[in-house]
């Protein structure tokens, strides 16, 4: 497969292999916008496996292409079971800085910025979601406006809804990981807390 940027699946596979080197590559979140699980399952599985093996980051995973159905999203989410991954939906519209045109892009383009804002305004163990920390200011609109029932369907499948509210704009309205079992680790902020603690302990040990 070749993505919209002309990169082949093997290009991603080679890059993923490099990221196994924890001495030279440090990060606490990874996303690969446009490389969605429905069409690039081999690559997204490799990224997830690498993320789990490293134990120091969370994979913001795109599940489906633009204009997919909720059933397709929840079905794809059902094939993943890990607290080291989180998924968001739907796609969002923003302005291309190079052309000035409106374009739809996958949610994983923006979500790491939400995490970074949470780190800067609070701490990694705060939920990167909601009106205060989950606002998507650079987003013009979501691909579709989710109903309450839509949001419930997504959240039950461990997919975090990107919701639209009057006078609030577009907001990340959930912080679940893709772990199926109900526990503290089915929350993004808990997984990120443990990642932060692991990094802190590692620095002390060094």
Annotated model-derived regions:
Residues 1-206:
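A glycine- and small-residue-enriched flexible loop/hinge signal that marks low-structured segments
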